[in-house]
Design a protein with these regions (language model features):
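Hydrophobic/aromatic-rich alpha-helical bundle segments in the mid-to-C-terminal region
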Residues: 105-110, 118-122, 126, 140-186
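A short His-aromatic
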Residues: 48-51, 55
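Alpha-helical DNA-contacting segments of helix-turn-helix folds
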Residues: 59-65
Length: 194
């Protein structure tokens, strides 16, 4: 007798959600297609129906995080107004994207350049960091931020604070709404020219 239990229909999006969790738990290199098949509850051939392989899943996952970050730089508040206000907006929104796309950004922050996809992701991350550093330099040049902290160092410290969220934040915490504001207040109250 055939089993007529309805199976969950998998989409690329639902497969990606499972994949990101497995990559974050086991690491990209430590994950096999068999691991993904087991975690998703579908056959490997079903996975291959949606994607060409594990590296394509990685590219889709880190691409989602990167698209969220680069989308911030195109927002009106990131391109119009004084540099310090644009920078504050970018910092706040970066923290918000990290919180809303936590598993995807966590994966992005863990890539090391071992594959072509990881190298691509690292290059895009460097480009994003560079654009934020340029905003910070402009705010320093305007006299809105302290000039005694080298902009490259300040940018690294900002990203260090934001990126550390992946290590301690867990979805469902009541403090989620206040995290982005706390990052902005802590960063800019410490960086503002006095």
């Amino acid at each position: 007798m055939a089993d007529h239990t309805p199976r969950t229909a998998y989409t690329v999006e639902s497969l990606l959600a499972v994949t990101v969790d497995v990559f974050n738990e086991r690491g990209y290199d430590g994950t096999s297609m068999e691991d993904l098949s087991r975690a998703a509850g579908i056959s490997k051939s079903s996975i291959y129906h949606h994607v060409r392989g594990k590296e394509e899943l990685l590219r889709l996952a880190v691409g989602r995080a990167l698209d969220g970050l680069f989308g911030i730089l195109a927002e009106p508040a990131a391109v119009q107004g004084p540099a310090v206000e644009r920078l504050e907006h970018v910092v706040r929104r970066t923290a918000e994207v990290l919180l809303t796309e936590l598993p995807y950004v966590t994966l992005l922050l863990r890539v090391r350049g071992n594959t072509a996809t990881e190298q691509w992701a690292l290059e895009r991350r460097r480009d994003f960091d560079h654009q934020v550093a340029e905003l910070l330099r402009a705010a320093v040049a305007d006299g809105a931020l302290r000039a005694d902290v080298e902009p490259r160092l300040a940018t690294r410290l900002l990203f260090g604070m934001i990126n550390s969220i992946v290590e301690w934040y867990r979805p469902g915490l009541k403090a989620a709404d206040g995290v982005a504001d706390a990052v902005v207040h802590l960063a800019f109250d410490g960086l503002r020219a006095r």
